[in-house]
Amino acid sequence: MKNFRRIGILTSGGDAPGMNAVVRAAARAALARGVEVYGIYEGYKGLIHDNMKLFSSPADLCNIITRSGTILYSDRCLEFKTPEGMAKAIATCEKNHIDGIIACGGDGTFRGATDLSNHGIPTIGIPGTIDNDITSTDYTVGFDTAMNTVVQMVDRLRDTCESHARCDVVEVMGRWAGHIALRTGIACGASAVAISEIPFDAVSYTHLT
């Protein structure tokens, strides 16, 4: 088994609630075991451009657990998908003697983590996306907060709808995954829910008006 002495942590893709908690927990666990931890800024872009900061003690992670977004910032990096970009990322790891990477993000982040692993850099992926579209896990980091936020907004919107005796259509995020729409639709008592996984015809909803 490889002896990890120094690791890097990054957040990539769209930000999700709870990413700071992930960074804090992973970094503190590593520091408690005598492993040096680098926070890599702007996802894989920071890995390519050697943009990182050493977390020398748990004190560097104080008061971030309740903050939204990610203190490491996040970005989508097309260069990382190229052979040249991957070579730069590997060179950064070798230069800084980084033994492994922890990457928090969605499906694109996981593809990047797989590529890093295939190039000899041990990488762990932590599912962090409001879309909840990562396999082999019931809930991704950020999904629960996204659902609760939508429910709160719909509860407020319902008052206006009832005041004007009308029906409103609410569009939520999720890209090609309908988890937010389905779960919040059930929680809010929606008359109907349309998700991308199930083909639907807008005409079939006219009876609701």
Task: Give short role names for the model-derived ranges.
Residues 22-26, 108-121, 181:
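Short Gly/Thr/Asp-enriched flexible loops that form oxyanion-binding sites at enzyme active sites
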Residues 206-209:
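Conserved small/polar residues in nucleotide/adenosyl-binding loops
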